[in-house]
Amino acid sequence: MEESAASGGYHMLKPADKQDVYPLSSAQKRMYVLNQLDRKTISYNMPSVLLMEGELHISRLRESLNQLVNRHESLRTSFTEADGEPVQRIVEEASIDLHVFDAEEGEAEQKIKEFIRPFDLSGAPLIRAALLRIADQKHLLLLDMHHIIADGVSRGIFVKELALLYKGEQLPEPKLHYKDFAVWQNEAGQKERMKEHEQYWLSVLSGELPELDLPLDYTRPPVQSFEGDTVRFRAGSGTAKAIEKLLAETGTTLHMVLHTVFHVFLSKISGQRDIVIGSVTAGRTNADVQNMPGMFVNTLALRMEAGEKQTFAELLEQAKETNLSALEHQEYPFESLVNQLDLPRDMSRNPLFNVMVTTENPDKEQLELQDLTISPYEAHQGTSKFDLTLGGFADENGIGLQLEYATDLFSRETAEKWSEYVLRLLQAVAENPNQPLSSLSLVNETEKQTFLEAWKGKTLPVPTDKTVHQLFEETVQRHKDRPAVTYNGQSWTYGELNAKANRLARILI
């Protein structure tokens, strides 16, 4: 996730007048609509697991959780409709149960999966907690919230405050709550301020929008299930150092490099150059909301078209400009953009893009309390909001990467192979960023020879109702920018070869 750029956009944020119900923010509205379409989905749950090692006082933990719930209005919020519009209602007081279960170490993953289940948005609080007792001195705290009340930053706020409350510290009362932001966002003045941002996004996404055509293992189902899995892999310290040098020389970020690498990868497996890749921003552009729990994260649609003769370094510079411009206009709600573009509704895919790139700081912070250590515990949710999501982070061991994929569309074997391709591209451009995009290969020489041997002597059936040049023209339409012929070190794409053939044909006619 890219850091939010500083902005003065929230300078008029103030406590809202007390009401029975409050409007939803733009991001909340989209979450509400998605939940109404499928109330059994867990794709917008936000589970987290904390490993607690040492002397744990369960009664104190239970009390601290309920103090946290009553400290933040967002944790006491429910969602319903009034006059045909979704609204949020805040209850004055709420409580959650902390269910305690005994479990073996090997049972933890299954217990975590069983813990994650759909939320009913009409009933507050939209947070659950459970405790797995693995041993006397080892517990797993399971927390789950709905995305409509929180984001990744919120989760970090909750964990730190929970630890402080457990220690018995008195925390200052929040001056502002998320409903204050939602009311502010719905004011007429803010809608007017959004017009400049709106014009930027409508300009970037003007004309015919590209639809990424990925090679699928399975037929796309009519309704997206959001079921997924993840392949985790790493770039070693050598590649990480080379990338650090590249970042310093180009003034770019790891997010920009991964965006560019992912674009090249997607272009090579799809044959398309004009691609929209999603990204996210924390959306907290003012100090007043830095420690406010709620749904601030915004989605950005990064559209980029690679040139036929570009090098990776040139495309990286383009990605830098694309990302910086997008961050300048990040306040415009993605939900409003989707509505303005009037995209056709398709339950089988996401609007605007089906792939995403993210970068986040790894959550490895340990909290040391008296006789108790709290640290993150990695658990996989088993969902994928998009066809593919490339995630990355830098740490002391290099660069950590993960490819999340929709299991309705791709096999594990394909995802693992594509992870190797992404890593190969990253290693290649780290070593030499000035390579032409056309020279970057997903496969190594051994794999090339294996493919050639596998196809040697094989024939494929061809349509008998079309001429050779018609079949070639159709191939050009599908793979215009892919290499078609290589001879004596020179390469021509299908588009270039077709242009040469047409020139020769005009001479002969």
Question: Across the structure, where does each feature detected by a protein language model lie?
Answer:
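4′-phosphopantetheine-dependent carrier domains
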Residues: 1-9, 48, 164, 249, ...
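Adenylate-forming
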Residues: 29-39, 47-56, 65-67, 81, ...
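Regions immediately C-terminal to embedded phosphopantetheine-bearing carrier domains
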Residues: 1-36, 63, 176-180, 197-199, ...
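Non-catalytic N-terminal regions of enzymes
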Residues: 1-6, 64-112, 165, 177, ...
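A Lys-centered signature of the CheY-like receiver
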Residues: 151
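Conserved AMP-binding/adenylate-forming core of the ANL superfamily
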Residues: 413, 470, 484-509
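Key residue(s) within conserved catalytic/signature motifs
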Residues: 5, 11-16, 20-22, 59, ...
